[in-house]
Amino acid sequence: MFAEGRIPLWVVAVIAGLGVIAVVGLFFYGAYAGLGSSL
């Protein structure tokens, strides 16, 4: 996929950041929409 042997650090940081934001967003969305029923 990349010409280099390893993935650039900024690509890993962006993917990790988006993953964390997605998990936190889904958690708060589930808590808000479920009003505690998901717990």
UniProtKB/Swiss-Prot annotation:
The keyword Kinase does not apply. Keywords: Membrane, Photosynthesis, Photosystem II, Reaction center, Thylakoid, Transmembrane, Transmembrane helix. The chain crosses the membrane at residues 7-27. It holds the Pfam family PsbJ. Its main location: membrane. One of its GO terms (biological process) is photosynthesis. It comes from the Bacteria. The keyword Transmembrane applies. It is found in: Cellular thylakoid membrane. It is a single-pass membrane protein. Signal peptide: none annotated. One of its GO terms (cellular component) is photosystem II reaction center. Belongs to the PsbJ family. One of the components of the core complex of photosystem II (PSII). PSII is a light-driven water:plastoquinone oxidoreductase that uses light energy to abstract electrons from H(2)O, generating O(2) and a proton gradient subsequently used for ATP formation. It consists of a core antenna complex that captures photons, and an electron transfer chain that converts photonic excitation into a charge separation. PSII is composed of 1 copy each of membrane proteins PsbA, PsbB, PsbC, PsbD, PsbE, PsbF, PsbH, PsbI, PsbJ, PsbK, PsbL, PsbM, PsbT, PsbX, PsbY, PsbZ, Psb30/Ycf12, peripheral proteins PsbO, CyanoQ (PsbQ), PsbU, PsbV and a large number of cofactors. It forms dimeric complexes. This is Photosystem II reaction center protein J. The gene is psbJ.
